[in-house]
């Protein structure tokens, strides 16, 4: 038995003569281009994504301006999706809630109700909240009625919408943006609006301004959530090229046994940090945590308290939080935005500011052209009225004596030498208004229109005149950002050292900021996250702690070392000859000579022990040197105006944990050492003028020139 399949006759108009691969590739490409240009990537000019632009336009059209009554969020978002945005209402409300969030650098929407206060907050349902434009938000739409930007039909052709908003401040740089599309992603950090406005004025005046000047005007990001930028690596590259990686750190303060988290890096949610801490405690990686509580509320903001166990240091817990959780992370900036052809590309900070200034020039030009057209038309009508006023009785007689409007129009044109447009305007006036025309008022209006015509004509034809107007308007717009809420929130801690590195799998390792290299004195390091020890080894931190590792050739991860502000040196003490000690030199001119036997070897997970007791006023270890009394070795210490050579034999051997002894008295105007190293006795740049001195004697004043030790003769 043979089965047959009845195939209905197909409409040839519905049949595609195309392979499935070609079909899907075509439609995937179409969707990709759509997601890039109409959803995820903002414009470089007004700094807004299409959904954000449509939301603000709808609010402007609904008169939801500052001072006016706000409208229920569900009604606003429904109007946007119904009239302008062919997508779901949930995504529109999410975008609106983000623009009304407290952690937004500049709040574009004034939200009434439970909108997000910290990153990760979920807003109340749209039926419970209301919204209207804030003052900065209204500045983005203020010139829409001046025909300042192009308008295009909406998706259904029933409305029109602007291709860009006539923004009076650069939204993209001030508020930042994050978006992922097919093949493209943008991640723009927020910046301080005052700094950005100052940079706009500077580039408007000097378009070829140097990068150094730009980096001074905009030294780095400034998020509404606060946090801090650690170090300078990647910042200049980001500002000058639009792409760069830099480290961002949350704010953790120590109060007794508690570590209090009050600020998070951008894009990091509170629950993400708490979940990570719980996982670390459960896995044993953070064994010193006794408790964690979330005391966050809407009045005081973020407050997560992590309590250290008895016998554990809260400072150490703080360091582990920075190293092992997203509280310190790398921000990979990528300034991707759409150009005038709606094509994505990379922009530098300078490029984005110039694009904004180009938008402002276009806005001033188009609104001036629109206003010039209106002024020209009014001047023409006023000129006709002034001719009519020369003999108002004759004009009234012509109008009353005419049987039709056409006859009256022709009569006025012939009698007063005016054109049809002027005659129609006269005929549109009521007779009582026509007879009460005041020549003085007409003359004053004509003079005012003449002056405005000349000014507008100059703006249309002269780019330099538009530049002056743009600068004046930037000054006025900058007044929006005078309040304390626009003070810099993100700390730029350029002198700090990043302590952690995040990998794709979530693991983190310690980073040593300096690339230590192996030399004949045993200083070493490895740039791949491991310290390769041989025998026994020291690791010395700038806060005076030391770690004595065990194992013959045993590598240990930097992640196993408790975090400190910086690692001063790494010394292989196990291979030193008999009689060698470790000298720890502090910035305040003290030295501690320690016998390695005073420190017991520790495993890789050891927390280290006290090395030298530091002064409270910013003291730190600046050098860790293996020293010996043999071979005439001495310590060369260098300050800003002086240097000193101290023989090792004059430095007493002390127990670890002491404050050390003073060995470099400072000359007037000094209070800190710059460096210290091992020197052959009596030689500084080949000069024997620098002699070894007893430890307590004054140092020798120098010129500040290079005084590094010279090779032995």
Swiss-Prot record:
PROSITE patterns: TOPO_IIA (PS52040). Maximal DNA relaxation at 5.0 mM MgCl(2). The active site is at residue 128. One of its GO terms (biological process) is DNA topological change. InterPro entries: GyrA/parC_rep, Gyrase/topoIV_suA_C, Topo_IIA-like_dom_sf, Topo_IIA_A/C_ab, Topo_IIA_A_a_sf, Topo_IIA_dom_A, Type_II_DNA_Topoisomerases. The keyword Membrane does not apply. The keyword Nucleotide-binding does not apply. It catalyses: ATP-dependent breakage, passage and rejoining of double-stranded DNA. GO terms for cellular component: cytoplasm; DNA topoisomerase type II (double strand cut, ATP-hydrolyzing) complex. GO terms for molecular function: ATP binding; DNA binding; DNA negative supercoiling activity. It is an enzyme of class 5 (isomerase). Its cofactor is Mg(2+). Catalyzes the relaxation of negatively supercoiled DNA in the presence of ATP or dATP but not other nucleotides. Individual subunits have no activity. Not able to negatively supercoil DNA, it can however introduce positive supercoils in DNA. Relaxes positive supercoils in an ATP-dependent manner. Catenates and decatenates DNA. Generates dsDNA breaks in the presence of the quinolone antibiotic ciprofloxacin, showing it is a topoisomerase. Belongs to the type II topoisomerase GyrA/ParC subunit family. This is Topoisomerase subunit TopoM. It comes from Mycolicibacterium smegmatis (strain ATCC 700084 / mc(2)155) (Mycobacterium smegmatis).
């Amino acid at each position: 038995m043979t089965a047959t399949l009845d195939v209905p006759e197909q409409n040839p108009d519905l049949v595609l003569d195309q392979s499935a691969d070609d079909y899907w590739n075509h439609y995937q490409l179409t969707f990709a281009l759509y997601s890039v240009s109409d959803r995820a990537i903002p414009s470089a000019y007004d700094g807004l994504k299409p959904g954000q632009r449509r939301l603000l336009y709808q609010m402007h059209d609904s008169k939801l301006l500052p001072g006016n009554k706000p409208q229920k969020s569900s009604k606003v978002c429904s109007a946007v999706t119904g009239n302008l945005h062919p997508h779901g209402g949930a995504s529109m409300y999410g975008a609106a809630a983000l623009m009304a969030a407290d952690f937004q650098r500049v709040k574009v929407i004034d939200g009434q109700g439970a909108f997000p206060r910290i990153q990760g907050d979920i807003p109340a349902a749209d039926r419970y909240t209301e919204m209207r434009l804030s003052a900065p938000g209204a500045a983005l739409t203020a010139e829409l009625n001046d025909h300042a930007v192009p308008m295009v039909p909406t998706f259904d052709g029933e409305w029109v919408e602007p291709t860009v908003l006539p923004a009076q401040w650069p939204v993209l740089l001030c508020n930042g943006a994050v978006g992922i599309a097919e093949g493209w992603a943008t991640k723009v950090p927020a910046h301080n609006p005052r700094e950005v406005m100052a940079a706009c004025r500077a580039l408007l005046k000097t378009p070829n301004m140097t990068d150094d000047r730009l980096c001074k005007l905009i030294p780095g990001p400034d998020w509404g959530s606060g946090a801090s930028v650690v170090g300078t690596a990647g910042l200049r590259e980001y500002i000058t090229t639009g792409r760069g990686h830099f480290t961002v750190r949350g704010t953790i303060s120590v109060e007794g046994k508690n570590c209090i988290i009050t600020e998070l890096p951008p894009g990091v949610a509170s629950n993400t940090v708490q979940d990570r801490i719980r996982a670390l405690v459960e896995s044993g990686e953070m064994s010193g945590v006794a408790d964690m509580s979330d005391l966050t509320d809407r009045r005081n903001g973020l407050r997560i308290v992590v309590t250290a166990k008895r016998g554990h240091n809260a400072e150490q817990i703080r360091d582990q939080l920075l190293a092992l959780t997203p509280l310190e992370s790398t921000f990979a900036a990528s300034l991707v935005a759409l150009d005038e052809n709606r094509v994505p590309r990379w922009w530098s900070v300078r490029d984005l500011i110039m694009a904004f200034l180009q938008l402002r020039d276009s806005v001033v030009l188009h609104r001036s052209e629109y206003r010039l057209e209106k002024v020209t038309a009014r001047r023409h009508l006023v000129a006709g009225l002034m001719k009519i006023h020369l003999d108002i009785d004759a004009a009234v007689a012509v109008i009353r004596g005419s049987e039709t409007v056409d006859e009256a129009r022709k009569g006025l044109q012939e009698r007063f030498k005016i054109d049809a447009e002027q005659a129609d305007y006269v005929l549109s006036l009521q007779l009582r208004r026509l007879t009460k025309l005041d020549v003085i008022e007409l003359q004053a209006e004509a003079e005012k229109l003449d002056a405005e015509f000349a000014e507008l004509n100059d703006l249309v034809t002269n780019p330099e005149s538009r530049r002056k107007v743009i600068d004046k308007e930037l000054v006025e717009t900058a007044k929006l950002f005078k309040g304390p809420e626009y003070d810099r929130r993100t700390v730029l801690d350029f002198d700090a050292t990043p302590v952690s590195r995040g990998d794709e799998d979530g693991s983190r390792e310690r980073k040593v900021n300096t690339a230590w290299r192996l030399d004949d004195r045993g200083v070493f390091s490895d740039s791949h996250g491991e310290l390769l020890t041989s025998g026994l080894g020291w690791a010395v931190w700038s806060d005076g702690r030391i770690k004595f590792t065990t194992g013959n050739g045993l590598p240990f991860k930097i992640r196993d070392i408790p975090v400190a502000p910086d690692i001063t040196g790494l010394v292989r003490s196990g291979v030193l000859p008999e009689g060698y000690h470790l000298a720890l030199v502090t910035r305040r001119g003290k030295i501690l000579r320690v016998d390695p036997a005073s420190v017991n070897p520790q495993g890789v997970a050891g927390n280290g022990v006290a090395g030298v007791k530091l002064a409270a006023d910013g003291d730190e270890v600046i050098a860790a040197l293996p020293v010996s009394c043999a071979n005439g070795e001495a310590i060369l210490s260098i300050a800003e105006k002086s240097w000193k050579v101290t023989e090792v034999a004059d430095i007493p051997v002390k127990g670890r944990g002491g404050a050390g002894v003073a060995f470099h008295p400072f000359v007037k105007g000094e209070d800190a050492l710059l460096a210290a190293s091992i020197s052959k006795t009596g030689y500084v740049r080949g000069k024997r003028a620098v002699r070894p001195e007893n430890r307590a004697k004054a140092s020798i004043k120098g010129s500040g020139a290079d005084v590094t030790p010279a090779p032995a003769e």
